[in-house]
A protein has these predicted regions:
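Extracytoplasmic/secreted proteins, especially bacterial periplasmic and envelope-associated proteins
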Residues: 4, 23, 27, 32, ...
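An extracytoplasmic/periplasmic, membrane-proximal ligand-sensing/linker region
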Residues: 132, 149-164, 169, 222-283
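Sec-exported extracytoplasmic/periplasmic mature domains
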Residues: 2, 6-10, 29-33, 48, ...
Length: 283
């Protein structure tokens, strides 16, 4: 966006690193950032004022669905029985990285595992980011890790390259997916074909939730319009920068959005012939 938009408009965009969805919500609410990437789950929490968020964030608007956050629950083969997420019970008294503390990764991991009946009080929880989780798996310090990310996830690639036949990414059955979706219809089945990761010799049947771009409601309509337009006019350019953006497409732009669209984004989508459902029209 910065490369394509700044030379022709007065819109300047700069990226910052954060601890993820939870911190992005806080920074947007405080006005320190105008745009942020949120997991779909955190977007639903934020709009409804439920879960771990302290309030309903009614000053937020959706801009676009980005790519899907694909759940990778990677464990050592010695705990695998069924090959599904229910095998997480075999990690009781073992060490598992849930993600960085207070991150969206931790939040969604706890939500999913709670929904399928896994008691995390019985698991020795480590709070590690993606790279450190892969390192800890390789070093034998943990027995599993939670990596929700676009495919291919670099931490999972590293784990499979180094541990190959010693690890498994757990599947989800239709019944388990229904349990996860009992509060919010966010997750969908996601197939990771064999060969996506090094030494991965069979398909992985996991689930995914949308990652969304959100904006403060007070960002000018024209700015959001230009940014949204620039994103979709330059998808091929984005694909070369980040492989996860290859999953983006205009026809998926409003799928799974948990809060109303910013009027600037809505204007662009209407121009493209996309019908916007009533629930996504900001009052």
């Amino acid at each position: 966006v910065k490369v394509k938009l700044e030379p022709t408009t007065n819109i300047s965009v700069s990226a910052i690193s954060s601890a993820g969805s939870g911190e992005n919500l806080k920074l947007m609410d405080e006005g320190q950032i105008q745009f942020g990437i949120l997991q779909g789950l955190y977007g639903a929490y934020a709009w409804n004022g439920t879960g771990p968020v302290p309030q309903a964030y009614k000053n937020l608007r959706s801009v676009s669905m980005l790519w899907q956050n694909v759940e990778h629950f990677v464990v050592r083969n010695n705990v695998v029985e069924t090959g599904t997420i229910s095998d997480m019970t075999n990690l009781y008294d073992e060490s598992f990285s849930i993600g960085a503390r207070n991150s969206g990764t931790e939040g969604s991991g706890r939500f999913i595992l709670g929904k399928v009946g896994i008691d995390l009080e019985q698991v020795d929880i480590a709070y590690l980011g993606y790279g450190p989780s892969a390192d800890a798996m390789q070093n034998g310090n943990i027995d599993g890790m939670n990596i929700p990310a676009g495919v291919p996830a670099s931490a999972v690639t590293r784990a499979y390259a180094n541990l190959g036949g010693e690890i498994t990414t757990l599947d989800f059955t239709e019944a388990q997916l229904a349990e996860v979706n009992s509060d919010f219809e966010l997750w969908t089945p996601y197939l990771i074909p064999a060969g996506t990761y090094p030494n991965q010799d069979k398909d992985i049947n996991t689930i995914a939730q949308p990652n969304i771009m959100a904006a403060r409601a007070d960002v000018p309509e024209e700015d959001v319009y230009q940014i949204t337009k620039t994103i979709y006019a330059n998808l091929a350019f984005l694909n070369n920068i980040h492989p996860a953006t290859k999953a983006m497409a205009l026809e998926k732009a409003i799928a799974g959005l948990p809060m109303p669209l910013h009027p600037g984004a809505a204007r662009f989508y209407r121009e493209q012939g996309i019908e916007i459902p009533e629930r996504l029209i900001a009052e």
